[in-house]
Amino acid sequence: MVLSKTVSQSDVSIHSTFASRYVRTSLPRFKMPDNSIPKEAAYQIINDELMLDGNPRLNLASFVTTWMEPECDKLMMDSINKNYVDMDEYPVTTELQNRCVNMIAHLFNAPLEDGETAVGVGTVGSSEAIMLAGLAFKRKWQNKMKAQGKPCDKPNIVTGANVQVCWEKFARYFEVELKEVKLSEGYYVMDPEKAVEMVDENTICVAAILGSTLNGEFEDVKRLNDLLVEKNKETGWDTPIHVDAASGGFIAPFIYPELEWDFRLPLVKSINVSGHKYGLVYAGIGWVVWRNKDDLPDELIFHINYLGADQPTFTLNFSKGSSQVIAQYYQLIRLGYEGYKNVMENCQENASVLREGLEKTGRFNIISKEIGVPLVAFSLKDNRQHNEFEISETLRRFGWIVPAYTMPPNAQHITVLRVVIREDFSRTLAERLVRDIEKVLHELDTLPARVNAKLAVAEEQAAANGSEVHKKTDSEVQLEMITAWKKFVEEKKKKTNRVC
């Protein structure tokens, strides 16, 4: 079963205009061709199809790095054929990963003694990192419950409803109940008080988010830690905290060094961070570090020797490329603390330019906070005539990819547009985006509202039938518009290839 959708379900042929210089036969779409074709033709066919992809630099939906220095690109290409798991064959690559783990652990204030090495691993992203951290929490909790002679078959984890989907995957794949703290209008992150109220003896950990996907806001990890310390004292439990710092882990240490969210807090036992977000590496690298070796149960670590030497491993996959690990090490030594600080401050300044430009239009409410991930989340003050989904769709004509989405349960009537500010998003682009948004608003203002047009037709028909039309409330109209546009966007997505 193919989970992603394709443009056509029929096994029609693929043709390419310029590839006809090398080959005149068409290619089947879903079957391997019987014969070989020239390399020039294969390249041209694929290149022609990829032209219809969006421009990664203008993809403002993604947190993932889309630009690196040419020197780092060369290092990555030079190591693209190295399988990272062959540690005995590529010992220097393994050493570079270990250096990265230790640098990140020190960045997060891990309580390491002089000469002590950090406990952590490189992953293909924060999703795998969260799976590994969750498994460690689950196994530690199971061992504790078994030692106390208590049942250990109903673990749960407490999170906010704003968590990324990988937390839902962890809960479903590894049979852990997910207890979500609902959001509310104006408060789009987990409330520490409500989270601690949901903690019970079966809670393996509370997950705090440093940089919400929805609006970039940092959750109050220190407040959560303090409340949980008190609850643990009252109950005799030892419920720990995991910090999902996928987005904020490479931001907070450089811009908000006084903010306590990491291993300075005693209940924080593990932290994950995405190297391919604000770690400034192309997609495919994440990290998870533990407070100390006692927080990672030994029985989860495998030892293999069929690649030439005894190798401890704790991953969900086996083979993976070395390029991203090498690229992460390059960025850490190339930029250093000063360089990362400069990049993050520049991102924040560009986010401020965009925020101020949107505020000057007088048309938007800014949902994101100034302290947090450098992004701008905003919604229309008045969406009775046109909504955020229409703005998102129309902006694509200018090349911009700006997502529109609804908030999670209890705040799902709020629709938001979000622009992520990455290193390659300049002040000039921010100013240009504001101008293009103003053009879109002007264009939409000149068009009749779809809901009003439908209402006029309904009133006409009702008058002819001698009946009355029930006019919906503003909130009913808003919800109807959001639902319709959400369905429209989802249907469009089904018609194009999507990564699962």
UniProtKB/Swiss-Prot annotation:
Which keywords, in A-to-Z order, does the entry hold? Calmodulin-binding, Decarboxylase, Lyase, Pyridoxal phosphate
Fetch the Gene3D superfamilies from UniProt: 3.90.1150.160, 4.10.280.50, Type I PLP-dependent aspartate aminotransferase-like (Major domain)
Q: Where is this region: Calmodulin-binding?
A: 469-500
Question: Which of the residues bear the PTM N6-(pyridoxal phosphate)lysine?
Answer: K277
Q: Which InterPro entries match?
A: Glutamate_decarboxylase, PyrdxlP-dep_de-COase, PyrdxlP-dep_Trfase, PyrdxlP-dep_Trfase_major
Question: Single GO molecular-function term?
Answer: glutamate decarboxylase activity
GO biological process entries? glutamate catabolic process
Q: How does the record describe its quaternary structure? A: Homodimer.
Q: Which family does it belong to?
A: Belongs to the group II decarboxylase family.
Could you tell me what this protein is called? Answer: Glutamate decarboxylase
Q: Which organism is it from?
A: Petunia hybrida (Petunia)
Record gene name: GAD
